[in-house]
Amino acid sequence: MNDTKTPGDKTLHPAPGKTLTLKRPVEQGTVRQSFSHGRSKSVVVEKVKRRVFAPGEAGAPSGTPAAAPAATPAPAAAAPRPATPAPAAPRPAAPATPAQPAAEAKAPAPAPTPAPAAPAAPVAEAPKVEAPAPVAAKPEAAPAAPVAEAPKVEVPAPAPAPAEPVAAQPAAPVAAAPAAPARAPEAPRPAVSAPRPAATTSSGSSSSSSRPAAGGAQRSGAAPQRPGTSGGPGRPGAPASGQRSGGPGSDRRGGPGGQNRPGQNRQGGSGVVLRTLTEEERNARASALADARVREVEERRMAEERRIAEEEARRRAERERAERAEREAAEARKREEESRRALEDESKRRAEQEARKRFGEETGRSGGASAPSTSTARPLTPRPAGTTTTTGAPAAGEEEDRRPRRGGGVPPRPAAPVKLPKSAGGEKHRGRLTVVTAQSGEEERQRSVASFRRRTQRMTGHRGMQESKEKIVREVVLPETITIQELANRMSERAVDVIRMLMKQGQMVKITDVIDADTAELIAADLGHTVRRVSESDVEEGLFDSADAPEDLLPRPPVVTIMGHVDHGKTSLLDSLRKANVVSGEAGGITQHIGAYQVTSPLGGKITFIDTPGHAAFTAMRARGAKVTDIVVLVVAADDGVMPQTVEAINHARAAKVPLIVAINKIDKPDAKPERVRSELLQYEVQVESMGGDTLEVEVSATKQINLDKLLEAISLQSEVLDLKANPDRPAEGTVVEAKLDRGRGPVATVLVQRGTLRVGDIVVAGAEFGRVRALITDTGATTTEAGPSVPVEVLGFNGTPEAGDRLAVVESEARAREITEYRQRQKREKAAARSAVVRGSLEQMMSQVRSTGRKEFPLIIKGDVSGSVEAIIGALEKLGNDEVQARIIHSGAGGINESDVTLAETSGAAIIGFNVRANKEARDSAERAGIEIRYYNIIYDLVDDVKKAMSGLLAPITRETMLGNALILEIFNVSKVGKVAGCRVTDGTVERGQHVRLIRDNVVIHEGKLATLNRFKDAVKEVLAGQECGMSFENYQDMRAGDVIECYRVEVVQRSL
């Protein structure tokens, strides 16, 4: 090819008559390149345009036939390269960098002639970096036909295709990507590959020989820049040109470009024919390129490490600066605190001195009193100002030290110490405090002495306030127990102060804890209050036994209690008096409930009778009857005489200090002996009138109604002697004789009114229960609106079932009733807790007793119709136990059996006993599923007997030994299949086979067991009589000797009972 040296456009002549013009091959641009670590920089990008051939020019130079086969191997070697653009992508970055030196050469050149030299370098450099093999193939084809270079290399055109976009990738990856596909269809690939040997090899391609003049001019134009830009593989001169340094393109350009271009410069402007590269040179170039790539990767890694190290150092420096600033601020705060404390101590000392001075002066001088206050106030005022001045200097110094750092971009802003004078002075919400205002002290001078005194009091924990405040002494009413909150409220003190005092005494308590009256009194006394102790039982004051005026008392009917032994005719006698038939409705013909009735006397008055059970289990009922009665009628059967319950009734009457009337019943029977009864009563100090005593006696017959009128006359006479009176115009008082839980009516209490009048609507209290009277029912079943003294009625309206024997009273309000019942319920709970505490305290003792004696328990759940019957059953069952077994009542109550009772029985394994009550359907079904036994009784005898039998079954049976006889061992025989057999003679009694025996040697029992075999003359026999000889063998024992004595006895198991 020919290269002209005209200053105008350069023309390349690949063949005669053909002219190729290159116009503006390079375009420059600036791109902002970002890196992964967040940094970015500007990069100058040059775009190289392809030279476009006319369609006729591409096919015109036909070339020699020999050149085609020579060029054929080149596409074969270059074809695989475009198929794998991934590895080739980073390599062709070199062409972009050679374009930059070309641009540098273009800037100082006065003529645009050197500009076309730029496309030759990048296009030729790309295949050199991509793969040396295609580059070597093209020069081999060039010597064969130098003129036909362009057409021959038209086939390997795909090789530059990946090189074109990749060449621009290092410089501007975003901009180069769309440029490549845009120019691909316009420019024929041979045009790009034709000038490639001229710039790539620089050492002699065939194309350079065809245009030596142009090549010389091109190289001479680039000569002033190339030596400066080529500096070996590392490209040290690249950064000085103002282009980007450290990129991959600069390293790759420096390797091969630096080796060949000085040779071109030495040739000057003359066109010469360059020789083709040898195999050694190609290998050396390839190795140089590989070394350049390795160095490039290493430099990248080192640059990244340097960047990371610099970033870490920068962050470390920032942290150190922040820590140093924090330490300085902390030290400043510490200094401020120390100075503040010193000033406070000084001011406190001065205040104390001033106080002592004022105390020594006369109190009557007002002027002298104001002077100390002024002197006291003046030292206090400058103290905050002094504090501000002390702290202001270091604060200002630190502020000045921080200003350069804030200007330098240091983000941390430590808290300015100037805020400390604000807290030291106690200033709040006065606006922002700056260094200037803190040093000037204007804010502090505006504060008053009172505000400073308040701050001082806050600092000292209100000690000064407590000393100066006038104490208000109160009278504190203390019950037996009180909560801390309630105690504090009554003293008008803070609860935390009370808790603090208790903590000083070593008690860790909460505000809701309960303390006793002694502790509360100590606390109240320490706080300066006076104490008045009251008891919780004071709520019951005035509830009972209030005195009545004599003029308000009116006569009332007598209350007569009929007592005596069981089956002595008490209920029959009362039926005869009432003209009723109560006996026929009683189960078993015995009275098991206490009943109250009113009978009209033949003399015109009314008499109230209370019928008590005679069974031994109903002792409590008889005691209650004796307490509420005025007269006791002791019924004694003439044919039976005085019995144990008769004696008990006598003792109850004496304990209640009530007169006694003896009614000798059943005088109509043939074996009646009234005289025997009178004589037996003398043994218990009961002397009737017929025997010179003062006790009235009447011989009656309940069934025959003999002398009933005489009995009523005796009762009336006795009541006249007693002169019974009561005040009906007052709130009612009475006694609960019996109580029960009725399914339809709820809790029902049989009440005997003793004083006052009970009306419907009254609020009543009985024991731990209260309620409003909804209805009053007499003994005949009639409903009444009021009941006066000595009138028995059934009261409906209680919120719970009261206990028999509880006293009833009418209160003025429901609040009072609730207060009383809450107190009584609390008392009941405390008693139960005390009992359980005693049980817990003796638990080890009880368990050791159970282990040692084998004591067993029979758990029971008892439900009865009335509370009195339940009480009697519990008392009777508790008496059944002994040291080995006892009845344990899990639960008891009045009312029917429900599901909760069955669930409790299932949990505790107890049996359920119902006395005159039944279980509902749900309870029966639940008991059937759980296998719980429910036993029903209506006679207390049967109930107690069955429980006794069941408890007797828990007793361990005893064994009883019956001696049968003795035998003496005469000789020992060894028998096969049997072992040792003792030949014996029965000395006394008999010896039976299978009975227990003892082997005695030297009067010591050696063995106890059973007799296994008993033979006589080789025949097995059941027994051997005295004087006969026999053979014996024992079960599992062989150590028998002649002269031993065998004792035979029978063991009998005897079942025990309570």
From Swiss-Prot:
GTP binds at residues 564-571, 611-615, 665-668. Residues 1-12, 292-364 have a biased composition (Basic and acidic residues). It is found in: Cytoplasm. It comes from the Bacteria. Residues 611-614 are annotated as: G3. Keywords: Cytoplasm, GTP-binding, Initiation factor, Nucleotide-binding, Protein biosynthesis. Residues 82-95, 109-119 have a biased composition (Pro residues). Residues 54-81, 96-108, 120-156, 164-228, 368-396 have a biased composition (Low complexity). It holds the Pfam family EF-G_D2. Residues 564-571 are annotated as: G1. Residues 589-593 are annotated as: G2. Residues 555-725 form the tr-type G domain. Residues 1-468 are annotated as: Disordered. One of its GO terms (cellular component) is cytosol. Residues 701-703 are annotated as: G5. InterPro entries: EF-G-like_DII, EFTu-like_2, IF2_assoc_dom_bac, IF2_II, IF2_N, P-loop_NTPase, Small_GTP-bd, T_Tr_GTP-bd_dom. Its main location: cytoplasm. Residues 665-668 are annotated as: G4. The keyword Transit peptide does not apply. Belongs to the TRAFAC class translation factor GTPase superfamily. Classic translation factor GTPase family. IF-2 subfamily. This is Translation initiation factor IF-2. It comes from Azorhizobium caulinodans (strain ATCC 43989 / DSM 5975 / JCM 20966 / LMG 6465 / NBRC 14845 / NCIMB 13405 / ORS 571). The gene is infB.
